[in-house]
Swiss-Prot record:
GO terms for molecular function: calcium ion binding; DNA topoisomerase binding; ErbB-4 class receptor binding; histone binding; identical protein binding; insulin receptor substrate binding; laminin binding; mRNA 5'-UTR binding. This is Nucleolin. There is a cross-link at residues 301, 328, 374, 381, 516, 580, 592, 627 (Glycyl lysine isopeptide (Lys-Gly) (interchain with G-Cter in SUMO2)). Residues 653-702 have a biased composition (Gly residues).
């Protein structure tokens, strides 16, 4: 009856009864701490009040009362306030606005009371009291109906969650300004004036429902709460369990926000990374522009723009003493006199060459016939631009001409080689060396001229023609560098005076087609020469007539050079020469100086006495240097002794050792059983290599004794 009397109070009085006193809040906190640990199975009941909130517009008044009490129970927990402050409090009144007219004046007050409950504590009583005031006396039946409605609505809990989630978001957008701030002071005054006469049993039941609803709301709504700041609500009367849960939710929110921030940052980074990629082409263009500045500079050596027509010719041997304008005028007039119109003339910055553009291919072909005409006293060269032909391609269609007269000119060669597109005379110190490179349009033309013009007489001398490039190297290896075959046609001249020149030798060997006097880096003769003839008969004749002839105070020695790689060669060439027949007084320094181009010399000595064994080794940088030195010093003398030369056997072939030979005599460092030096290959051997007299890497089987026989004890 007391409850009914209180229910009859005015709305103003119901306001005072709405929120619970602070003492009840503290009691409820203690109860909540214990209930949070015990009640884990009541999560399904939490959604039940939400379902009733949905039915408030269609069910009878009795159910409306129940639904509002439960509706107030769902949004009021402090946990919910911590996650979504102001959002839930505003959402509930918004839904109540749909209820009958009686409820309309109350939502504002209820909203204030609910906001009060949201801010300090999950006061369940505060939520129930406004429901009683709103219905004016029907709260007596409310509590009895709670249990009935709980049983009826358990099956619909999942649907309530979905429906509430659907309705809450639109309400949240318009409700963010929390009305709790102005309403909270009034509710606090009402708490002080109001003495709650309700039974403790009602409080317990309502608080149990509230705790269950708190747990359920906490688990259902964290996703919504993460977008709203949780700092708005002052945490005064939260229990320890709620604070821990709030901390966990806050951490989850922070993690979610961090993840979102990271995703945003990643998106921004990707956009920033995409922009440089887009900008990269611009940078590359700039870089390529810089890189192309060097080639551009080369292109800019040609005065003027790019070719105006596809029909252009290269013009060379211009007079560099004239200006660009003078050259252009003279070249244009030259073609005009021959009924050819030059569309454009572009000269190089050095004014030694240029390019001329024509209107048609016919004009271009006619202009080619004018090569050799003079412009400012110089005979111009006209030819098609070479383009980007590789060196290999050009070498394949180029011939090397030897045994030319030292006074021959390019014009004289052009008369013989009419198909040549370019002729380059080789000179040294302003004087011709008697050789020239003759380039043709194609490799077939080069082969044709080699066959037809080989041995042709030019200015009283028989010319010798050779291939260049890889083709010429193959011919050298096979001994077919020309049409000649059979015996060697080259003589090796040694003991030559250092003052003798190629011209001096040319006067002696009149039939020679090519003469070469190797020189050291200082331009001084190395004391030997190669003299090539047109045939083996000519070479043999010169050998018989000129051997041991005196030239410039020294007696020369001549011998036939065996073709490289031929079976007549005594052994395989290498970078090391074996020298036998040395005097005991010959030192390594003397031995090295005796061979021009040598880099190191070693004399083999007796391990016990230290005296010379009478032989040694001389190293060179290349096989060519070694071969030239060998041919020059063949049958030569060192310190009055005539020496014998041979190639040092490569590693693993036995015979006289290579680089390790001089270290330890026959036994090398290992004594009489081999070791690293001596006869055993490249310093590994002795007669038996490391293993002794028989076998091993050095291998005694290939050793051919030269000189006296050596016995080991």
């Amino acid at each position: 009856m007391v409850k009914l009397a209180k229910a009859g109070k005015t709305h103003g009085e119901s306001k005072k009864m709405a929120p619970p006193p602070k003492e009840v809040e503290e009691d409820s906190e203690d109860e909540e701490m214990s209930e949070d640990e015990d009640d884990s199975s009541g999560e399904e009941e939490v959604v039940i009040p939400q379902k009733k909130g949905k039915k408030a517009t269609t069910t009878p008044a009795k159910k409306v009362v129940v639904s509002q009490t439960k509706k107030a129970a769902v949004p009021t927990p402090a946990k919910k306030a911590a996650v979504t402050p102001g959002k839930k409090a505003a959402a509930t009144p918004a839904k109540k606005a749909v209820t009958p007219a009686k409820v309309v004046p109350t939502p504002g007050k209820k909203g204030a009371a609910q906001a009060k409950a949201l801010v300090p504590t999950p006061g369940k009583k505060g939520a129930v009291t406004p429901a009683k005031g709103a219905k004016n006396g029907k709260n007596a039946k409310k509590e009895d109906s709670d249990e009935d409605e709980d049983e009826e609505d358990e099956d619909d809990s999942d649907e309530d969650e979905d429906e509430e989630d659907e309705f809450e978001p639109p309400v949240v957008k318009g409700v963010k300004p929390a009305k709790a701030a102005p309403a909270a002071p009034a509710s606090e005054d009402e708490d002080e004036e109001d003495d709650d006469d309700e039974d403790d049993d009602d409080d317990d039941e309502e608080e149990e429902e509230e705790d269950d609803s708190e747990e359920e709301v906490m688990e259902i709504t964290p996703a919504k709460g993460k977008k709203t700041p949780a700092k708005v609500v002052p945490v005064k009367a939260k229990s320890v369990a709620e604070e821990e849960e709030d901390d966990e939710d806050d951490e989850d929110e922070e993690e979610d926000e961090d993840e979102e921030d990271e995703e945003d940052d990643e998106d921004e980074d990707e956009e920033e990374e995409e922009e440089p990629v887009k900008a990269a082409p611009g940078k590359r263009k700039k870089e390529m522009t810089k890189q192309k500045e060097a080639p551009e500079a080369k292109k800019q050596k040609i005065e003027g723009s790019e070719p105006t027509t596809p029909f252009n010719l290269f013009i060379g041997n211009l007079n560099p003493n004239k200006s660009v304008a003078e050259l252009k005028v003279a070249i244009s007039e030259l073609f005009a006199k021959n009924d050819l119109a030059a569309v454009d003339v572009r000269t190089g910055t050095n004014r030694k060459f240029g390019y001329v553009d024509f209107e048609s291919a016919e004009d271009l072909e006619k202009a080619l016939e004018l090569t050799g005409l003079k412009v400012f006293g110089n005979e111009i060269k006209l030819e098609k631009p070479k383009g980007r032909d590789s060196k290999k391609v050009r070498a394949a269609r180029t011939l090397l001409a030897k045994n030319l007269s030292f006074n021959i000119t390019e014009d004289e060669l052009k008369e013989v080689f009419e198909d040549a597109v370019e002729i380059r005379l080789v000179s040294q110190d302003g004087r011709s060396k008697g050789i020239a490179y003759i380039e043709f349009k194609s490799e077939a033309d080069a082969e044709k001229n080699l066959e037809e013009k080989q041995g042709a007489e030019i200015d009283g001398r028989s010319v010798s023609l050779y291939y260049t490039g890889e083709k010429g190297q193959r011919q050298e290896r096979t001994g077919k560098n020309s049409t000649w075959s059979g015996e060697s046609k080259t003589l090796v001249l040694s003991n030559l005076s250092y003052s003798a020149t190629e011209e001096t030798l040319q006067e002696v060997f009149e039939k020679a087609t090519f003469i070469k006097v190797p020189q050291n880096p200082h331009g001084k003769s190395k004391g030997y020469a190669f003299i090539e003839f047109a045939s083996f008969e000519d070479a043999k004749e010169a050998l018989n007539s000129c051997n041991k002839m005196e030239i410039e105070g020294r007696t020369i020695r001549l011998e036939l050079q065996g073709p490289r790689g031929s079976p007549n060669a005594r052994s395989q060439p290498s970078k090391t020469l074996f020298v036998k027949g040395l005097s005991e007084d010959t030192t390594e320094e003397t031995l090295k100086e005796s061979f021009e181009g040598s880099v190191r010399a070693r004399i083999v000595t007796d391990r016990e006495t230290g005296s010379s064994k009478g032989f040694g080794f001389v190293d060179f940088n290349s096989e060519e240097d070694a071969k030239a030195a060998k041919e020059a010093m063949e049958d030569g003398e060192i310190d009055g002794n005539k020496v014998t030369l041979d190639w040092a056997k490569p590693k693993g072939e036995g015979g006289f050792g290579g680089r390790g030979g001089g270290r330890g005599g026959f036994g090398g460092r290992g004594g009489g059983r081999g070791g690293r030096g001596g006869f055993g290959g490249r310093g590994r051997g002795g007669f038996g290599g490391r293993g002794g007299f028989r076998g091993g890497r050095g291998g005694g089987g290939d050793f051919k004794p030269q000189g006296k026989k050596t016995k080991f004890e």
